[in-house]
Structures are given as C-alpha cells and as structure tokens.
C-alpha cells in the first residue's frame, strides 16, 4: 500500500463526477480547490461532487481550500500587453493607470515604501526583471531599468526578492473564501504567501470566531521571509506546503532544493504533515509520460520525507489528469520500497519526546519494523495517536479507526495513515474488536496477519494512549491448554481411535483425536502436532508430545467435531489457540 499521500487540484479537466471517481480510484487522497480561480458557486459544486463520489466509493477524501493570498499583480495594459525591451526605462505607478511604454501600475500601493535603489522587481513568474533606479515619492512613481526583454500582459504576478513587504496576512477575499470553506465543511486551509506567525494567527482567529477551529491551517512557504521565520510559523501551524513556484522566483532557484529538504525535515521532527508542490509532473499537462527529471523530483521528495505530493495544472487543466495520478502512484510505491525504514525510525528515536502518546507511537513504529507486522491499528478520537505513529515511519500502513468523519478526513494528509470511520467504542475490548473487524472488512489486513494495536485508558479521551498490543488476526477455531512453545501448520487428520489414526497418512499432519494411547504411537510419531479432547498435563497426549518434542494442545472441547478432517490449520502451543488456515504466530 502506498504511504505517501497524493493531493490533486480539481479544475475544468477533472471536476465531473466521472473524472473524480477515476481520480479517487487512481489514488487521490486530498482534493485541492484553488481559490485564485473560480467563484463560490463553482467551488460549492465541486465540493458537493467530491463528497458524493467519495461516499459512494467508500473512500475518505480530504478537501483543501487554497487561498489566493496577499499577492501583488499588474493592472491592465494598453491593447492587453506591453513589449518591454532590455536597457529601456519604465515607471511603476502607485496609482492605477492603463499600462503603456512609459508606465504601468500594480495592485500594491505601498510598494514604493518597501523598495530602494538597486532592488530587483520580477514580473510574470520571474520572466522579466526590472531594477529600481530611483523613486519619486511625491508622484508615487518607482523608476526602473528593464534588465531583460519580454511581453507583459494584464494581471501578471509581481515578486520582490529579499524585500519585506507590508502586505496583510489575509485579504478581504481570503476571509470571505475561508468563511465559505467553514460553511461547506472543508478540512484544510492552505494559506498563501505566509511570511510570519502572525499571518497564521490572523487566520486562526477568523476560524475560531466562526466555528471553524477544527479546520487545519497549512501555510504555503513562498518567499524568503517565510523561510527565515519558518520555526515560528510551524509552531502555530498544522503543517506546511513547500510551494516551489513563487518560492523559486523569490529565492535563487539553486537554493530551492535545500529549502525543500530543510522544511520537510522540520515538519518530520514536529510530527506535522508537509506537502511538496508545484511542477512535479508538469509536462503531463500535455504528454502522457513524465520526463525523467520529473520522476526523480517526485522520488526525491519522498526520500526527503514528504507526507504528500501535489498535482496542480496536471489534474486541474491538463490532458492527462488520471494518468498523472497513476504515474505519481507508481513512482511513490517504487520509491517507498527502497526506503530503509529501520534507519529512519532509529534516527527519529534519538529525538526527545515529551508525552505518553508519542512514546507509544515511537515504540509501535520500532516494534512494527522489528516484527514486520502487516499494519498498526490505531483507534483514535482526535487523530493524534495515528500522527505520532506515522511520525516515526513504521514501514507499514497505520489504520486509524475513528468514529468521527471529520477526524478521518484530517488524517487523509498524513503519511501512511489510512482512516476508517467506525462505531464509537466504550471499552478496551470493544476498541480492540472494532479496530480489527473494520480493518479486516476494508481488506487492509487479513486472517493470519500480525498487527500492532494501540489504545488508551480511559476510553474516549484524546491524548490518553498508553497501551500497545501485538495481535494475530486469526479465524480462531478452538482453544485448549498448550504444552510447549512451538507452532505447527498443516493438514488435519481427525481420528477417534487408533485404528482410524493408523489408516491415514499422518506424515507432517496435525493429528486431532479424543484421547491418544499406546496403539496410536506409530501415527503420532510421524505427525507435526497433536490436539486432544482429553485434558491434563499428565494425560497420555501431553506426556508423549513432550517426549517427542512436538507442539501439543490438550483439553480442546469437541475437537473432533469442531475441526474438519483434511483442513489446513495452525496450532500455537504457547497460547493454546488453534486457527483456521495458515496464521502468522509470533
């Protein structure tokens, strides 16, 4: 099972119910809605479709609202665009004007206060570079020199690398969009152009004052100021997005890979999800196959430790949206198979942990790797336990069983976590039973698999995880008194007396009988294990089994009736348990 999550941007190329169904089947975990485009009616229709299709498919899909953010853009140009020529001069006006060969204006009227002579201004994703040569504050004009030629059209992005601007953390449009998201029940807010912790707190205050405190805030790090303030930003956030598009314009491109690794590592240490985004499979907007560099980019983000990888134009507007998700899924699966999870968990074990839940998470991950378990089952009310286990990268899926749909969608972004919505349990026994039954029902685990189950007392209270159990998921057939510590697996021979036992080939079989005796010895000597209805450590079966060194289970009531002849079973002498089929027993 793939552990790295896939975030898909939903747009005209993917908004139909048919395409959404295909994206979910291909592996989409979180649907991103880009509020830089479209109106509330369009986004509501998309949200409704995503929820409906996910419900019909029985899948958990989170919804991420990506704000437009406090960006700077150019205003309109005469005839739609200007031709800027290297070496010529052009002014930037703080008052809105129609752009011409002498002057154009931008949407941020305090730009003149933020730049100085020598400052660099980048236009249209950095394709055009201007250098500030002077300012006329009285007239509200910035004088610039055109460093490289290009066509400048309407509403193009403006970046000022290395300059701290006075833009607000949240615009009026952002606030309206976030309130819309609260009403529609989205799960995550991706906050664009976050520069400092106060930007995040401004959004959090809006959420808390409007019954939206359950929404998680994922700041997008897109400028040098955000990079410089990353620790304070992460402290007040629920995760991060490495938004490499604007980031690669705001800082030198050669620094982007280093910043990416640094941000991912900080999120890993904090146990918070991180999304790596922008141009991951960009060529698949037009082509059915990615470039080799793109495949390596996705793989390296996974090696870095990212929780999620994101598709933007590939799924929103591209020709091959489903193929893009399928490709990303294959790259992720192949990459994850090459990761040394023992090394990862050993490195993270050296970090300090300050609470019981995290200690259990660390222990569960380490034990999962040592025992090569099929999954870790983590019943949870808040999702915190599942996050803490995933933080230590157990190398197997973390199945988070919760009674809250909201909690399940929050976990859709967490590495390795597969949420299931189940019934609310009121006791430890119910928790264990519910988590196993739901995991089997969803086919994440099967009979015979070894799993780890975490739980907490008192039941139902967040942050009380204090129990870890190693459990064999088995189709339990019968139970008795085991003698010895061995396990036997094989075909059964059911015989009620010596004559029946000797009539069958017992070589390597498990002999099931009422009670053994001296006449049955030739059959017993060839068998792999012995099960008797007769109980007691002094019974013939117990004594003979010990002398032969084979696993024995005695005192199994109605064994010759319960256990069918010729069936494959597993007997665990240490626990005295008999399972149908081939069960993994520790």
UniProtKB/Swiss-Prot annotation:
Amino-acid positions noted as binding K(+) in the UniProt annotation, renumbered to this chain: 34, 36, 66-67
Residues noted as binding substrate in the record, renumbered to the chain: 32, 245-246, 278
PROSITE patterns: PYRUVATE_KINASE
GO-annotated molecular function: ATP binding; kinase activity; magnesium ion binding; potassium ion binding; pyruvate kinase activity
Cofactor(s) demanded: Mg(2+); K(+)
Subunit structure: Homotetramer.
PANTHER family: PYRUVATE KINASE
Name by which UniProt lists this protein: Pyruvate kinase
Species whose genome carries this gene: Sporosarcina psychrophila (Bacillus psychrophilus)
Source species taxonomy: Bacteria, Bacillati, Bacillota, Bacilli, Bacillales
Gene name per UniProt: pyk
